[in-house]
């Protein structure tokens, strides 16, 4: 059991993931940090970031992708020391303006699927930016989905095999 110290439930967290050490990575909206929590509920590490962190995704190099929600950004971060290896801001990815960066999913070819939730910006649909897209390791869009009429807001995805 772990108490976040954040009173309003909607300001707490969306997705928890376990890291290689068996601890939980808890991105918190209200405090703009990712907390590493042991299975006993003890804080192991707090890494301060930007925006409203939504989820983390472990990389083979030990870093993590962090979707920074309303920060309109996606970052590759070493959560042990807080060092940012890569950061994509709102207009840094050609062909995909970032809105609320939410769910992340690794692609089989080494790319990254990014859910670009558009619910907090009334101009998002008019911006014609994809709701979900895949980037390669150079940050280039190689696939996208942009069909608000059929799919509405997309915050997370998963694969079905």
Where are these regions (language model features)?
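Histidine-/acidic-rich catalytic cores in large beta-rich domains
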Residues: 1-161
């Amino acid at each position: 059991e772990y108490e976040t110290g954040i009173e309003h439930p909607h300001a707490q967290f969306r997705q928890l993931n376990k890291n290689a050490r068996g601890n939980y990575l808890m991105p918190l909206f209200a405090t703009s940090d990712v907390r590493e929590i042991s299975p006993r509920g003890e804080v192991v590490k707090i890494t301060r970031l930007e925006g409203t962190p939504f989820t983390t995704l472990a990389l083979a190099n030990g870093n993590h992708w962090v979707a920074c929600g309303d920060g309109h950004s996606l970052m590759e971060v070493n959560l042990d020391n807080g060092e940012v290896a890569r950061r994509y801001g709102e207009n840094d990815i050609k062909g995909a303006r970032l809105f609320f960066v939410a769910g992340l999913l690794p692609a089989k070819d080494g790319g990254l699927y990014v859910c670009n939730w558009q619910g907090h910006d009334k101009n998002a649909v008019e911006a014609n930016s994809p709701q979900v897209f895949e980037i390669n390791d150079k940050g280039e869009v190689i696939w996208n989905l942009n069909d608000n009429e059929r799919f509405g807001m997309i915050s997370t995805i998963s694969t079905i095999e």
